[in-house]
Amino acid sequence: MSTRNPQRKRRGGAVNSRQTQKRTRETTSTPEISLEAEPIELVETVGDEIVDLTCESLEPVVVDLTHNDSVVIVEERRRPRRNGRRLRQDHADSCVVSSDDEELSKDKDVYVTTHTPRSTKDEGTTGLRPSGTVSCPICMDGYSEIVQNGRLIVSTECGHVFCSQCLRDSLKNANTCPTCRKKINHKRYHPIYI
């Protein structure tokens, strides 16, 4: 009696075999993606004004952003000379903010300037100190206030200028320059006589 164990063959193969996955991919159809760009038609209305802000033109451009208020540029830039130096202007660059509202009078227009006119610089009516003056960046006193109060103008090794009292008080707390934090001590600064 010989018993044979017949081997069974599986038909169709394994469920997750590579061949099965390949057949599944080949038989399922995927919709093709169109790679062509569709043109978009731009309709330009007659009343709209288009301002190209990316180009550099020689003429100043005025843009009305709110339809009520507009900025008018009086003088935008200085014109260069042949040798490359800029011309000096006696008037300040400025712009005028005006309103279309009839209720507002012309006296209420706002003038915005980026530079101080020479007349106010000469009179000294501005709160800003002209260049060339010495002041302490800690107490904000100018040269005349420092000298009137019996203090000295002192400079550190790193070149920063303070009044003697402020620098002395600062060095009591930290042995560094108050401006650049370079290590200094009470022997590393000296008075300046102007």
From Swiss-Prot:
GO terms for cellular component: cytoplasm; nucleoplasm; nucleus; PML body. It catalyses: S-ubiquitinyl-[E2 ubiquitin-conjugating enzyme]-L-cysteine + [acceptor protein]-L-lysine = [E2 ubiquitin-conjugating enzyme]-L-cysteine + N(6)-ubiquitinyl-[acceptor protein]-L-lysine. Keywords: Activator, Cytoplasm, DNA-binding, Metal-binding, Nucleus, Phosphoprotein, Transcription, Transcription regulation, Transferase, Ubl conjugation, Ubl conjugation pathway, Zinc, Zinc-finger. One of its GO terms (biological process) is regulation of spindle assembly. Pathway: Protein modification; protein ubiquitination. A motif (SUMO interaction motif 2) lies at residues 50-53. The modification Phosphoserine is found at residues 98-99. Disulfide bonds: none annotated. Homodimer (via RING-type zinc finger domain). Interacts with GSC2. Interacts with AR/the androgen receptor and TBP. Interacts with TCF20. Interacts with PATZ1. Interacts with TRPS1; negatively regulates TRPS1 transcriptional repressor activity. Interacts with PML (isoform PML-1, isoform PML-2, isoform PML-3, isoform PML-4, isoform PML-5 and isoform PML-6). Interacts with PRDM1/Blimp-1. This is E3 ubiquitin-protein ligase RNF4. It comes from Rattus norvegicus (Rat).
